[in-house]
């Protein structure tokens, strides 16, 4: 039984070698007398020359018949995949209908999903094929250690790409991913002063139309905001000017100094006063009705050295000091 398995393996390897070389064509020897029917049923017998396609264009009647593959015996289960692969490749070679690659010594690309077959070692037995991966491995029998290795079939010129998205025989190599196309953002341009003053000789421009309207009142002399306090007939061009004036009547002082208890009715007065403090910082000034947290400056280097030497630090500056 092992001899039969080795014979079938050697026949499959010989078929692959002949197809890769492209110039060797197996022909059945003349049938001896009385052995016509028995020789035709030999395992792996090549089809007769009449079944091979001619040099002319193939027609419906010139299609070669499919090779008859006998059912493998239970003991030869390891050789059946090799015989089946050899028969399928022989069928593809016979049904191509063109003999250009036979004359040039080139073999067509395998259509098993890979561009190059993967040869196996001569010493390593290959009794199992991987149907899931579809890798076409050529394995030599163990008994024939002097059998030459099967060369890989080169790709035929002009042949289409192998199905399955594989290129160059790389396993699992899909099509190259497209470059990441990040949409470009429009560069942020600073807002332009679109609202120009229409009066001749005035080149002022503003970002908002409300600011332009209040500016135009300086040209027209219009003062729509009037004080409604008793015995006060003052008018203003802007609403914030009226609110500032109204505090003079009520005595409200909403701007308080962060360094002393003094308060002021106008923010510019508070800023002018706060600058007199040596520890003043602009972040201490009240901003839009909310006082920011005053920033405490770190102690001076001389004070740190005096505290390290044992002498106590000098008196801390009082926030209630008013200049």
Swiss-Prot record:
The UniProt regions of compositional bias labelled Basic residues, in chain numbering, are 184-195
What PANTHER family is this protein classified in?
Answer: KRUEPPEL-LIKE FACTOR 14, KRUEPPEL-LIKE TRANSCRIPTION FACTOR
Q: Provide the species name.
A: Pan troglodytes
Q: Where in the cell is it found?
A: Nucleus
Reading the lineage from the top rank, the first entry is Eukaryota
CDD domains, per this entry?
KLF14_N
- Biased composition of type Low complexity is found at 40-53, 94-106
The taxonomic lineage of its organism, from the top, reads: Eukaryota, Metazoa, Chordata, Craniata, Vertebrata
| A Gene Ontology BP annotation from the UniProt entry | positive regulation of transcription by RNA polymerase II
The family note in this entry says: Belongs to the Sp1 C2H2-type zinc-finger protein family.
Biased region (Pro residues) positions are 54-73
Q: Where are the zinc fingers (C2H2-type)?
A: 195-224, 225-254, 255-282
* Molecular function via GO: chromatin binding; DNA-binding transcription factor activity, RNA polymerase II-specific; RNA polymerase II cis-regulatory region sequence-specific DNA binding; zinc ion binding
Q: Which UniProt keywords apply?
A: DNA-binding, Metal-binding, Nucleus, Repeat, Transcription, Transcription regulation, Zinc, Zinc-finger
SUPFAM superfamilies the UniProt entry points to: beta-beta-alpha zinc fingers
UniProt KW Membrane keyword: no
Specify the protein name.
Krueppel-like factor 14
A GO cellular component annotated for this chain's UniProt record is: nucleus
In its keyword annotation, does this UniProt entry include Zinc-finger? yes
An example Pfam family from this entry, by short name, is zf-C2H2
Q: What residue spans carry the region label Disordered?
A: 27-78, 94-116, 142-161, 166-195, 279-323
